Each structure stands twice: as C-alpha cells, then as structure tokens.
Amino acid sequence: MSTFKMIPLIILLIPATAKADAQTCMAEAMYFEARSQGVLGMLAVGVVIRNRVDHPAYPSTVCGVVRQGRLSDGRVYKWQCQFTFYCDGKPEIPTDPEAWTTARSLAKIVLDSRLTMQGLENATHYHATTVQPTWARRFRPCKQIGEHIFYVSR
C-alpha cells in the first residue's frame, strides 16, 4: 500500500478516536458528578462541559475540560480539579451499570447535537447544594436542577 493511500485512512481514524475519548470523558463526568440527579441532572453537567469547550477561557476538548486541574507533570492535587470526581482520590470505576449506560447514551446525545437546556445556554459552572464554594460569588446563579446550582459569568 502506498503512503498516499494510507494518509486518508489515518485522517479518518483520528477523529473517530478523539470522539470516542470525548464520549468517555463526558460520560464519566456525567456519571460521577450527577448519576443521583437523573437524566436532567446528567444532561445539565454535559451541557456545562460543552459550554466550557466552546468558551475561550477553557480547554478546547471535552477531556481537557473534564481533566482541568492536572499538573503538566501528570500529578493531580486532591480537590483542586474543576470536576471533583477527577481528583477525589477514588478510582473512576462505574458501579451502577444502568446509570453508566444512561451516561454513555446521554454523552453521545450532547456531543452529537447542539442540545441545550433552558437557562443553561451559557452556564460554565455548577456545584452541589450542600457546599458554598467561594468562587460562586463571582458568578450569577441561573438555574437549579436537582441538587446542583448552575452559574453563568456576571
């Protein structure tokens, strides 16, 4: 096979791999951050991730957004990540097969469409109602879904 014929094959494989990685990163975040919040809660987390990908202040990939907080040498400081599950010291192993299947399906929907949710069109942050992070004062609350409060820039 000539080099010329191999180039299109390589070009076609890169996006498919990147898309699979993006779906896994998105599904993990939706699952670990909001599986107890049902479909709407998981979708809301996915919308926030996609909003960040589209925003110039954040990484331009889903995995980059989800993993933001990892140091360049690969270390992670506990509780210093943008998404708590990623640096809580626990392994990311789904234990609820039904919720994991739902998260994978919802991640595909969020990634393959321009799905948005009313009130979350520009949301880039959220937190659980059980905490009051200091960063929240710098943002405007825009919606509560389940046990999460979502925010937009002021």
PLM features: what roles do these ranges have?
Residues L13-T17:
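N-terminal signal peptide c-region/cleavage motif recognized by signal peptidases
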Residues D21-R154:
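Bacterial extracytoplasmic/cell-wall-associated proteins, especially those involved in peptidoglycan
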Residues I7-P8, A18-A20:
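Cleavable N-terminal signal peptides
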Residues M1-I10:
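Sec-dependent signal peptide recognition
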